[in-house]
Amino acid sequence: MSDKRQCGVLLPVSSLPSKYGIGCFSKSAYDFVDALKVAGQSCWQILPLGPTSYGDSPYQSFSTFAGNPYFISLEDLIEEGVLTQKECDAVDFGSDPASVDYAKLYKGRIILLRKAYERSNVGENEEFRRFQEEEAWWLKDYALFMAVKQRFEGKPWSEWAEDIRLRWQNALDYYRRELYFEIEFQEYMQFKFRQQWMKLKAYANKQGIEIIGDIPIYVAMDSADTWANPWLFKLD
């Protein structure tokens, strides 16, 4: 950042206007960047972008490195042809435009994102494969963690079966085979998040707007980071 004084606005991505339950990387985000520029501002401060866990707080995340799938723009997926306007409009995201109904958001948005994944034919997408390779150092553990968490009905990893809780190699191999498509779905959501976020960030920077990010102070106990790297933490 510049040594000169700067002025900006703190606005969580989730607070941007949206008819699909939560603010995201849609046209509203670009409109906000334009509004900042017109107002003579030079900074946009946001809250952490990680996938939220229990309590839906951005400061308690399932991963230090992953992005929140809720922020993926459904409008962009409609433009890509992997979702339809009718499908998105048919989902109940809640009736209060001033607040986020996370229960309905989780149910509805994940269903739509899964449809987009199934229609995307990511296996033939070279950009997706390159993303998998370049981000494998965190992505493989995160995607497996989220897939196994779903298999165990959302329970924290400390309550999973012993073999996968302790990451025995035979268990890791088994779940990677058994949950292949769910793992790929998790990776697809991270791919779309990264793609859309970098596009928005590049646009903001081109308009002279810098992004001030934020991260949680601590790594969450129930996270892919802790599960995959237990030797880095003091665990009971």
Give residue spans per PLM region.
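Catalytic cores of eukaryotic secretory-pathway lumenal/extracellular enzymes that build
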Residues: 232-236
